[in-house]
């Protein structure tokens, strides 16, 4: 039988082993802490996405407007085409997007594995151009391509293991047991780090530019976000904290991005699933 001291020692050894195995590198060369593998993040994200979409469908919250569906499919399809070129493993992803009927919510996201969602509030509150919408979705897709979902899940797991270790050390089984629930909750609610946001800005503006959209729109998009934030902070900013000097950093990227695709030649459109 394990004693509590032995359990604590085992937990510490296990945590140390996990830490050593958790080293990874992002597409920009940044070191990443990944206790959760990218493939595990894809599997968990798919399950969460299907559950979310099912609930939305039951509540009649999935948009079926042909014009909006075509617009979203066209723009995201071009971004996915570029993603396939720059990140070949993403060719195996089940790319799909749900358009959620919620005029008050200004948000969008992309889970590991290419499972996306966009809220109608983005269009109604921000009056987005195609170029600006491409920047938002390029940013979101970049979070998935750069394994930011796995990073958030890893942070949640580290918190969970820490809580369980404290519970074991203090002979408090209830603390150890509830650690798992805390970890699962954090995986869903933790915002991206500001470092991850800067990385998604960098990768996202490149994706959108290569797809044929104006890189200047990255700047005008965040100006609109800033104006809206003065009235009421959009949900987008609660999970996407703004890095310091975001607009200035994006401004510096515009000229080199224009050199990549000076004629804004449109990328081919990869067919993706619009969830209905």
Q: What are these language model-derived features?
A:
Residues 2, 7-11, 23-276:
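A Zn2+-metalloprotease active-site environment signal
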Residues 18-22:
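C-terminal motif of bacterial Sec signal peptides marking the signal peptidase cleavage site
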């Amino acid at each position: 039988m394990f004693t509590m001291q032995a359990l604590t020692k085992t937990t510490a050894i296990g945590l140390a082993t996990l830490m050593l195995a958790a080293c990874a590198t992002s597409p920009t060369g940044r070191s990443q802490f990944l206790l959760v593998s990218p493939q595990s993040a894809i599997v968990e994200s798919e399950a969460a996405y299907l559950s979310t979409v099912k609930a939305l469908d039951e509540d009649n919250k999935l948009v079926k407007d042909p014009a909006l569906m075509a617009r979203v499919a066209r723009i995201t399809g071009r971004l996915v085409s570029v993603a396939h070129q720059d990140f070949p493993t993403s060719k195996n992803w089940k790319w799909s997007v749900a358009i959620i009927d919620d005029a008050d919510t200004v948000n969008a996201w992309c889970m590991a594995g290419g499972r996306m969602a966009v809220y109608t509030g983005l269009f109604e509150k921000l009056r987005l151009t195609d170029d600006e919408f491409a920047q938002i979705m390029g940013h979101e897709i970049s979070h998935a391509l750069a394994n930011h979902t796995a990073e958030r899940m890893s942070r949640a797991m580290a918190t969970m293991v820490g809580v369980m270790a404290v519970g074991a050390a203090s002979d408090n089984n209830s603390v150890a047991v509830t650690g798992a629930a805390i970890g699962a909750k954090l995986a869903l609610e933790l915002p991206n780090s500001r470092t991850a946001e800067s990385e998604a800005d960098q990768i996202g503006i490149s994706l959108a530019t290569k797809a044929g959209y104006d890189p200047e729109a990255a700047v005008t998009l965040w100006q609109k976000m800033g104006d809206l934030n003065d009235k009421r902070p959009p949900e987008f900013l609660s999970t996407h904290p703004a890095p310091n000097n975001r607009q200035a950093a994006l401004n510096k990227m515009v000229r080199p991005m224009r050199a990549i695709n000076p004629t804004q030649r449109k990328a081919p459109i990869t067919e993706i699933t619009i969830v209905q």
